[in-house]
């Protein structure tokens, strides 16, 4: 079930119509990033469609008032899963503040930090009857060249080849929980 289905963002449609009428590099860069984000969402949707996800509630393209963008929220009977997609490449590490950093360029990515902020926001708005539901966060790495250094804990990282097995486990665990309730 889709609470909020995957759709083409309005901003992306608007920028596509403007890109041929302007030489603004900011507009072109924003269009590129939105297109990339939308393509990653479709890639994940293709993997999600390979499993039985009829018992999942999916909220696609969630953005908070703090401009934190979560690509997908999946709610099952036994957990809430927050996903943020990217295509970072190369060796990265997680610093002491929980920031993901490219070990070559030292570019800092706030994905994990944003997921954790969102996690605590979700926990705070859950009704008291649902507070026992765990909230899991996954920063999904679609680029096959992404590597995490051996000193960084990979708990919030989901590599491309791990996506489908992770979704299958989610589906199995959710079905088991449903059977226990019946």
PLM features: residue spans?
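Active-site beta-strand-loop-beta-strand hairpin of nuclease catalytic cores
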Residues: 74-99
């Amino acid at each position: 079930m889709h609470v909020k289905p995957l759709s083409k963002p309005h901003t992306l449609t608007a920028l596509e119509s403007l890109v041929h009428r302007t030489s603004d590099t900011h507009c072109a860069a924003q269009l590129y990033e939105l297109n990339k984000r939308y393509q990653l969402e479709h890639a994940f949707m293709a993997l999600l469609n390979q499993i039985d996800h009829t018992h999942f509630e999916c909220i696609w393209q969630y953005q908070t008032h703090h401009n934190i963008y979560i690509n997908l929220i999946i709610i099952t009977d036994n957990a809430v899963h927050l996903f943020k997609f990217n295509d970072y490449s190369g060796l990265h590490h997680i610093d002491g503040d929980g920031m993901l950093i490219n070990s070559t360029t030292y570019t800092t990515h706030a994905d994990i930090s944003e997921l954790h902020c969102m996690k605590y926001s979700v926990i705070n708005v859950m009704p008291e009857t649902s507070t026992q539901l765990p909230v899991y966060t996954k920063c999904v790495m679609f680029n096959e060249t992404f590597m995490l250094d051996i000193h960084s804990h990979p708990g919030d990282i989901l590599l491309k080849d791990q996506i489908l097995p992770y979704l299958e486990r989610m589906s199995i665990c959710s079905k088991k929980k449903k059977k226990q309730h019946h």
